[in-house]
Amino acid sequence: MKFSIALILLISVIILIPELVSGMDNINTEIPLEPMIISGLVLVIVYVLIAFDLIHRTLAALLGASTILFISTTLGAFNKNYQILSFNDAIDAIDFNVVFLLMGMMIIVAIMRGTGVFQWTAYKSYELAKGDIWRLTIILMIVTAVLSALLDNVTTILLLTPVTIEIALILRITPWALIFPEIMASNIGGTATLIGDPPNILIGSSSGLSFNAFLFNLGPIALITLLALIGMMYFFFSKEYKKNKNNNVPELLKRLKREYKIENQALLNQCLIVLGFVIVLFFLHDELKMEPSIAAMTGAMILLLISRTHIGEMLDEVEWPTLVFFMMLFIIVGAAEKNGLIPAIAEIVVQISGKDPTSTIVIVIWISGIMSAIVDNIPFTASMIPVVEYLNQVIPGIDPNILWWSLALGADFGGNATIIGASSNIVAAGIAERSGYAIRFKDFIKIGMPVAIVSMILSTAYLLIRY
């Protein structure tokens, strides 16, 4: 079924590409059609492979990047029209600021994981709730949102979901009554900062926007949306929350306290000091002119030295498939940008909006939200970054930063709509499935889609009113 839908989508796009190319005459007539069409097809094929989970997303990106380079060095040697992207251009297309920022934060979080602090946080959340399931859900959403803003939403979900499932089973409620609020809160909380969500990392690296800029501009709407989420989760799961599932709260607290405790207080103290140092460097980005990746890698190296953690073990904790995925994706998008496809997409947006700033803001946020629900928001954001750069140049009188906020809000909040919309959704669904609590695509949409729509309506109003 997935393959059939993917094939239909791919054929439809192949039919539409000539129409897209035909409208490119007014942008750059010097660019030959062959590399534009090939880079466009590769980009679409990779999207389809990722969106319908036909192969692992890292393998899909590797396939796309290697195809571009192979064609460029074989057919391109005989016909320059097939020189899609040179090897040097491919290396230049990779944003190593993003790669090293992710690597540094992965190392820091991996060391923190060994202290047991994340499991302890889950236990403390239940203790604060005093056995009240709805109160527990609110606390978990707040904790998840804050951790996602300070670390990143994928890591937060990876660490908290297994503990959340166990707590739900102890309380005898469906795990998804707690997992859903956590996923949604994670994506919303991650929106508030530069490092909270992978799309934000991509946007921040390309635009030069600082940690402070993200926090001050997106933090307020993240908080507003989180409050709306709390109300929506009660609407969807109130029956579960009202059930009296466990009358022996003191006994349960004793068990959780025994099992979910801080394993290494000294190491945790070191981690918190270093993490605080890194966050301070993020805040001082404008003054120091320091890239976030330098702050993250510096913190990771300091923590490795003072904690005396085995370097081999920590490198094993780095999510290399994710880093390779990003690098290959940069190459694919770089090829599409170099060969005129990205300006073509941007020109379509310009024509639809009539170069009106307000219309452009609305179009960017809603297209981003809709597309992020269909494909993972990471590859979509990577492909939209050059589009926004182009729009900032051709839309008269527009604040150059507002379209970045539009893209970030659309990609981050739109990702809540479906399982494949955001990496944190996929991670949580995978953990739940391995525990025997799989969720169907359509069941996820029933809750995720309303949350995404409400979030994007609030975001649109926020941007138009504030800016």
Regions found by a protein language model. Name each.
Residues 82-174, 320-394, 400:
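Membrane-embedded alpha-helical segments and adjacent helix-loop junctions characteristic
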Residues 2-23, 173-176, 180, 192-195, ...:
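Juxtamembrane and boundary regions of transmembrane helices in multi-pass small-molecule transporters
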Residues 6-10, 35-47, 54-83, 95-107, ...:
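Hydrophobic mid-bilayer segments of alpha-helices in multi-pass membrane transport proteins
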Residues 122, 155-166, 179, 192-207, ...:
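Re-entrant/interfacial helical elements at transmembrane boundaries that shape
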Residues 226-310:
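Long, contiguous bundles of hydrophobic transmembrane helices that form the permeation core
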Residues 27-41, 94-107, 149-157, 193, ...:
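Structural signature of hydrophobic alpha-helical transmembrane segments
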Residues 48-55, 143-152, 183-195, 284-287, ...:
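Transmembrane alpha-helix interface/packing and boundary motifs in multi-pass membrane proteins
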Residues 25-35, 52-58, 83-98, 211-221, ...:
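Interfacial loop-to-helix junctions that mark the boundaries of transmembrane helices
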